[in-house]
Design a protein with these regions (language model features):
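Helix C-cap/helix->beta junction micro-motif
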Residues: 40-42, 82
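Short amphipathic alpha-helices and their capping/turn segments at secondary-structure boundaries
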Residues: 1-3, 33-39
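Generic structural signal for well-ordered alpha-helices
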Residues: 30-35, 72, 76
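Oxyanion-hole/transition-state-stabilizing segment in secreted/luminal serine hydrolases
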Residues: 1-25, 52-55
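Alpha-helical initiation/capping and key positions within long helical/coiled-coil segments
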Residues: 25, 29, 67-70
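Catalytic His-Asp segment of secreted/periplasmic serine-dependent ester chemistry enzymes
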Residues: 52-128
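Structural recognition of the beta-strand scaffold that forms the well-ordered cores
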Residues: 5-11, 45-50, 85-88
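Internal catalytic-core helix/loop-beta-alpha segment
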Residues: 29-30, 41, 50
């Protein structure tokens, strides 16, 4: 079977539409997945990616998206409780000279992904 040395997880904005203001239910579902991984891979570090900022236009179109900061707060607390590392990727969006959003203002374009991969590797100490 697979023997990963690091696990990276990213659930996010699509779940905001499912859970709405109920971030605690989202966190509970996330914890369940992490517990399964920790049971199977007890010595493997787990990294949890933030939910990226969402544009005002996207929030106006889908008000439940406005809860993303609350979800990120819950993810940070969950990481502290479970011994995981929270990765805040918002600086990738905020520091970019280009608009990295799809027209929906919620999802990102292809150019985001190499930047994201590099950032995750840096946080995990996987890149010189």
């Amino acid at each position: 079977g697979l023997k990963p040395t690091h696990v990276f997880m990213a659930f996010g904005s699509n779940d905001l539409e499912t859970y709405g203001s109920n971030s605690s239910e989202f966190i509970a579902a996330y914890k369940t997945q992490i517990q399964k991984i920790q049971a199977a891979l007890p010595d493997v570090p787990i990294y949890i990616n933030c939910i990226l900022p969402i544009t005002d236009d996207a929030i106006a179109a889908t008000p439940d998206l406005a809860y993303y900061p609350e979800y990120n707060d819950g993810l940070q607390t969950m990481c502290q409780e479970m011994g995981c590392t929270f990765i805040d990727n918002s600086s990738i969006i905020e520091s970019s000279s280009e608009n990295l959003y799809e027209p929906d203002g919620e999802h990102v374009i292809q150019d985001y992904y190499p930047k994201w991969l590099t950032h995750m590797a840096q946080v995990a100490g996987l890149q010189a």
